[in-house]
Design a protein with these regions (language model features):
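Residue-level signal for mature regions of secreted extracellular proteins and peptides
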Residues: 11-12, 72
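Bacterial N-terminal signal peptides that target proteins for export
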Residues: 1-7
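C-terminal motif of bacterial Sec signal peptides marking the signal peptidase cleavage site
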Residues: 14-17
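A short, solvent-exposed, low-complexity linear motif enriched for acidic/polar residues
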Residues: 19-191
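Compositionally biased amphipathic helical and low-complexity segments enriched in hydrophobic
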Residues: 8-11, 25
């Protein structure tokens, strides 16, 4: 009986020493690029949306890791969704701990419609100058969007995720020239 107990303890020690699954608990890091495209709100010349945070959730108590915007010092990134109809641009990119991820969270902090003129410059930047003419600020009751999709960030690897911000479904007119946004964002692909 004593031999069985000793062998059981020895077997448990050997199993513990072998460590866990390297995919779930890697020691390195990899790169995640989050790209954005759109099918925008059709009645405007520009739809400027400011994102204040992008995070990725790592499986198994890994918690959330913040994904920097294109410029690592930027605290937000603004995109003119009208310019992203037939193209895509970078929302965030950075190094994350390698591992298995289950969710990306995107926070929209502000949005505005511009009816008379398109915006100048790139589709996405730290700031975009507001176009001239008539505009409407969009109320955003809850700007946090949780995108549940499993993906892996490999050690020394690169993962790219493309999201589609559906401007038509996200923006509704509430009357008296007022607008409300409930962000509708889907994941198109993960590579």
């Amino acid at each position: 009986m004593r031999i069985i107990a000793v062998l059981s303890i020895l077997a448990a020690a050997i199993v513990a020493a072998c460590g866990g699954d390297s995919v779930l608990s890697p020691s390195g890091s990899g790169r995640l690029s989050l790209m954005i495209k759109d099918s925008p709100y059709s009645d405007a010349k520009a739809l400027l949306v400011t994102f204040s945070e992008v995070t990725a959730h790592r499986d198994r108590e890994g918690g959330f890791s913040k994904l920097p915007f294109g410029d690592a010092t930027a605290t937000s990134r603004t995109c003119d969704l009208k310019k992203l109809v037939d193209r895509q641009d970078l929302l965030g990119v950075g190094t994350l701990p390698a591992g298995h991820y289950t969710q990306v969270r995107v926070v929209v902090s502000s949005a505005a419609l511009y009816f008379d003129s398109p915006s100048d410059g790139p589709p996405c930047a730290a700031t975009i100058q507001a176009p001239a003419g008539r505009s409407a600020t969009i109320e955003i009751p809850s700007g946090e969007v949780k995108l549940n999709r499993q993906f892996d960030v490999g050690e020394s690897g690169a993962t790219s995720m493309l999201i589609d911000f559906d401007g038509d479904r996200s923006v509704t007119e509430t009357g008296n020239g007022r607008f409300r946004m409930t962000p509708v964002i889907g994941i198109v692909s993960v590579q």
